[in-house]
């Protein structure tokens, strides 16, 4: 099979017998593919195309399979029954070394031609909701590609007016028109309505004084007790009192009344809610309201929406595009102004006045002075942004222009599409020649159902410009983000003074001897060069406050005297020989001022120096630890934190790692009270793996330091 134009999908007279095949190995030939699908029925033609190909389908070059590529294609059968057989075996179907993706053929409306429109095609009709007008008009069928002059009778109207009124020409006898008919795209059962039938009898509820932390889900859960909730929205901006504004759509008028009776003036999370039926936006309001009174989540046409003159700068910031949970700036936030700064001499559409009396004209400068709360307008109010487009209805740029062209002359438009596919991303931009046309299009199409989706239309502006404009409006009150940043600064306090104590690995002594005490875990440390038991040694000049070698019996009597050091360690003995001391269990240091010294320490720095010297001058036998100590010194207290890193020999016995004061307390009951006093200064960490010990030292009293493995 060759890739001729007749085999291109979209050109078939009948697409019901065509199937989509994805993930095709490009090294396979057409004959192999036909042979694979021939068991399901007679194959008429196939079409193959490489992924991410820049060539259009009609201009595809002769197929040259690459070395290793992925393709997709379409297989057309003679009979439509073959499609059902293929879909039954579609799951797990393989061809060559790849698993195929089999799907039914879906026709893209953009590929249809004018010849395929039949007289009985269903056209897309938009019925504008108006309680005072009954929509009994019949649907009309119009072919696509109509000029602006041919569809002038299909312009949406919420009030009685004709085409000349839309174009800016005054008319005293407007022709009523309530139906919008858009060219049919060959799709059935697709309607475009401003308000769906489910909401035809509902009114939006306005919720005031919402707490700042309330979300649309919280609002939904709170109002579902009054009836079925169809939608909720919470404004992202705070008022001057720190509250938010929200809206709720109920399923019926009875539910709205029930919600007002149950929830109005009722406390909710510390605030009193004000629930009421929202007023429709009206240009007859001559002052900017303090509360939002504009369009709702589901916009309803205003009775006088198209009867007033256009205020250029106010129109640009007059409404708010409400989204579920993330509403932006809209008319409900800023209100509306009845005056205008545009005169009739500028050939702009004049206002419709039921009394046929000219309205007063007030310049914008004077209006801005009287209403300083109105924010600046967008940079380009004639440029609109539309999103949530149905890709089955609006598939190309021309169809987007057909939707907006009834409101005025379009300067340019853009429909965002995925690269190399032509599939719409669901959003686009439309720029009008006149600002009035953009305002009319925005007011009418915002919230309208196009196909199966509700579109949202607002003025196009950059995010930075929008943030700058909103910050200028809310300059009197900081935003929640700025407030949070200011609160977080108070959580971090820098300490007054801190210094680091570095403890190095001690020098081991090969002449140390260990005496074993079988009843307790305590062991006394002896040195050949040191005096024996019972002999007292005067403190040396370099270690004035430290007496490193005292026997266990003398330690109990001198705990309140000069510095005593007790080291509890385990011992391994093999065949009667003394083993190496593997790990220190408990290390105590109790220091007291010498009689020759001052009764009080001179300063905090002197106290820190003594702690540092004491930690440096410890000599341990065969087992040692290299701690990392940090001392933070303030006016009256010194906090020392030590995190040791232990070293031990390979033949370490786990029994020697038992670290406790039990053995020491059993051997010397008279020292129990003193040990409890020492423990009162010690702050132990509950995490044993960290091996962290923190000691609080009082600078104005004798220092007690205890370093204990936790």
Curated annotation (Swiss-Prot):
<dbReference type="GO" id="GO:0005829">
    <property type="term" value="C:cytosol"/>
</dbReference>
<dbReference type="GO" id="GO:1902373">
    <property type="term" value="P:negative regulation of mRNA catabolic process"/>
</dbReference>
<dbReference type="Pfam" id="PF00076">
    <property type="entry name" value="RRM_1"/>
</dbReference>
<protein>
    <recommendedName>
        <fullName>mRNA export factor crp79</fullName>
    </recommendedName>
</protein>
<dbReference type="GO" id="GO:0005737">
    <property type="term" value="C:cytoplasm"/>
</dbReference>
<dbReference type="GO" id="GO:0006406">
    <property type="term" value="P:mRNA export from nucleus"/>
</dbReference>
<dbReference type="GO" id="GO:0003723">
    <property type="term" value="F:RNA binding"/>
</dbReference>
<dbReference type="GO" id="GO:0008266">
    <property type="term" value="F:poly(U) RNA binding"/>
</dbReference>
<dbReference type="InterPro" id="IPR000504">
    <property type="entry name" value="RRM_dom"/>
</dbReference>
<dbReference type="GO" id="GO:0010494">
    <property type="term" value="C:cytoplasmic stress granule"/>
</dbReference>
<keyword id="KW-0813">Transport</keyword>
<keyword id="KW-0694">RNA-binding</keyword>
<feature type="compositionally biased region" description="Polar residues">
    <location>
        <begin position="502"/>
        <end position="524"/>
    </location>
</feature>
<dbReference type="InterPro" id="IPR035979">
    <property type="entry name" value="RBD_domain_sf"/>
</dbReference>
<feature type="region of interest" description="Disordered">
    <location>
        <begin position="502"/>
        <end position="544"/>
    </location>
</feature>
<feature type="compositionally biased region" description="Polar residues">
    <location>
        <begin position="333"/>
        <end position="348"/>
    </location>
</feature>
<dbReference type="GO" id="GO:0008143">
    <property type="term" value="F:poly(A) binding"/>
</dbReference>
<dbReference type="GO" id="GO:0048255">
    <property type="term" value="P:mRNA stabilization"/>
</dbReference>
<keyword id="KW-0963">Cytoplasm</keyword>
<dbReference type="InterPro" id="IPR050502">
    <property type="entry name" value="Euk_RNA-bind_prot"/>
</dbReference>
<feature type="domain" description="RRM 3">
    <location>
        <begin position="401"/>
        <end position="474"/>
    </location>
</feature>
<keyword id="KW-0677">Repeat</keyword>
<dbReference type="GO" id="GO:0003730">
    <property type="term" value="F:mRNA 3'-UTR binding"/>
</dbReference>
<feature type="domain" description="RRM 1">
    <location>
        <begin position="19"/>
        <end position="102"/>
    </location>
</feature>
<dbReference type="InterPro" id="IPR012677">
    <property type="entry name" value="Nucleotide-bd_a/b_plait_sf"/>
</dbReference>
<feature type="domain" description="RRM 2">
    <location>
        <begin position="222"/>
        <end position="292"/>
    </location>
</feature>
<keyword id="KW-0539">Nucleus</keyword>
<dbReference type="GO" id="GO:0005634">
    <property type="term" value="C:nucleus"/>
</dbReference>
<comment type="function">
    <text>Binds the poly(A) tail of mRNA. Involved in the export of mRNA from the nucleus to the cytoplasm.</text>
</comment>
<feature type="region of interest" description="Disordered">
    <location>
        <begin position="333"/>
        <end position="357"/>
    </location>
</feature>
<keyword id="KW-0509">mRNA transport</keyword>
<dbReference type="GO" id="GO:1990904">
    <property type="term" value="C:ribonucleoprotein complex"/>
</dbReference>
<feature type="compositionally biased region" description="Basic and acidic residues">
    <location>
        <begin position="525"/>
        <end position="538"/>
    </location>
</feature>
């Amino acid at each position: 099979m060759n890739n001729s134009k007749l085999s291109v999908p979209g050109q078939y007279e009948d697409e019901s017998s065509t199937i989509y095949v994805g993930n095709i190995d490009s090294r396979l030939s057409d004959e192999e593919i036909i042979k694979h699908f021939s068991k399901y029925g007679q194959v008429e033609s196939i079409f193959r195309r490489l992924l991410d190909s820049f060539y259009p389908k009609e201009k595809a070059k002769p197929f040259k399979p690459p070395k290793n590529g992925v393709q997709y294609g379409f297989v057309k059968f003679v009979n439509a029954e073959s499609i059902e057989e293929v879909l039954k075996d579609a799951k797990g179907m393989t061809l060559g070394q790849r698993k195929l993706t089999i799907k039914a053929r879906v026709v893209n409306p953009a590929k249809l031609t004018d010849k395929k429109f039949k007289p009985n095609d269903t056209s897309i009709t938009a019925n504008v909701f108006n309680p005072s007008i009954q929509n009994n008009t019949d649907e009309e069928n119009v072919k696509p590609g109509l000029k602006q002059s041919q569809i002038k009778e299909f312009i949406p109207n919420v009030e009685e007016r004709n085409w000349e009124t839309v174009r800016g020409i005054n008319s005293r006898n407007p022709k009523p028109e309530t139906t919008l008919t858009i060219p049919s795209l060959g799709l059935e059962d697709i309607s475009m309505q401003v308000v769906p039938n489910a909401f035809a009898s509902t009114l939006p509820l306005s919720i005031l004084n919402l707490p700042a932390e309330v979300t649309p889900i919280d609002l939904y859960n709170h109002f579902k007790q009054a009836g079925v909730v169809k939608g909720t929205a919470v404004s992202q901006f705070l008022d001057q009192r720190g509250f938010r504004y929200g809206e709720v759509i109920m399923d019926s008028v009875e539910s709205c009344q029930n919600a007002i009776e149950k929830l109005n003036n009722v406390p909710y999370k510390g605030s009193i809610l004000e629930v009421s039926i929202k007023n429709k936006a009206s240009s007859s309001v001559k002052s900017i309201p303090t509360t939002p009174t504009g369009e709702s989540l589901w916009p309803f046409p205003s009775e006088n929406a198209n009867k007033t003159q256009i205020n250029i700068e106010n129109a640009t910031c007059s409404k708010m595009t409400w989204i579920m949970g993330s509403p932006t700036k809209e008319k409900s936030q800023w209100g509306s102004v009845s005056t205008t700064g545009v005169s009739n001499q500028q050939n702009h559409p004049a206002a419709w006045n039921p009394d046929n009396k000219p309205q007063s004209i007030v310049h914008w400068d004077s209006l801005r002075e009287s209403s300083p709360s109105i924010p600046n307008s967008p940079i380009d109010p004639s440029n609109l942004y539309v999103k949530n487009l149905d890709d089955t209805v609006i598939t190309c740029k021309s169809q987007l222009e057909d939707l907006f062209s009834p409101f005025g002359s379009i300067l340019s438009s853009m429909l965002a599409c995925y690269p190399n596919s032509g599939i719409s991303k669901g959003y686009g931009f439309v720029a009008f020649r006149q600002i009035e046309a953009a305002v009319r299009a925005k007011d009418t199409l915002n919230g309208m159902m196009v196909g199966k989706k509700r579109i949202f239309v607002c003025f196009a502006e950059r995010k930075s410009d929008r943030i700058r404009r909103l910050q200028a409006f809310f300059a009197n009150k900081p935003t929640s983000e700025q407030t949070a940043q200011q609160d977080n600064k108070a959580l971090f306090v820098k300490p007054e003074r801190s210094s680091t104590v570095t403890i190095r690995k001690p020098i081991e002594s090969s002449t140390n001897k260990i005496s074993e005490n079988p009843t307790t875990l305590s062991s006394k440390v002896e040195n050949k060069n040191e005096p024996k038991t019972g002999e007292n040694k005067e403190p040396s000049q370099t270690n004035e406050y430290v007496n490193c070698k005292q026997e266990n019996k003398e330690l109990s009597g001198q705990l309140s005297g000069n510095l005593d050091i007790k080291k509890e360690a385990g011992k391994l003995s093999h065949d009667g020989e003394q083993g190496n001391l593997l790990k220190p269990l408990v290390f105590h240091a109790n220091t007291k001022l010498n009689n020759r010294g001052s009764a009080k320490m001179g300063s905090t720095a002197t106290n820190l120096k003594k702690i540092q010297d004491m930690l440096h001058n410890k000599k341990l036998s065969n087992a040692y630890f290299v701690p990392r100590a940090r001392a933070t010194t303030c006016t009256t207290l010194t906090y020392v934190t030590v995190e040791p890193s232990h070293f031990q020999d390979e033949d370490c016995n786990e029994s020697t790692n038992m670290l406790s004061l039990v053995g020491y307390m059993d051997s010397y009951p008279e020292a129990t009270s003193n040990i409890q006093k020492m423990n009162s200064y010690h702050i132990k960490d509950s995490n044993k793996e960290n091996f962290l010990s923190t000691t609080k030292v009082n600078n104005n009293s004798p220092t007690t330091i205890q370093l204990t493995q936790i």
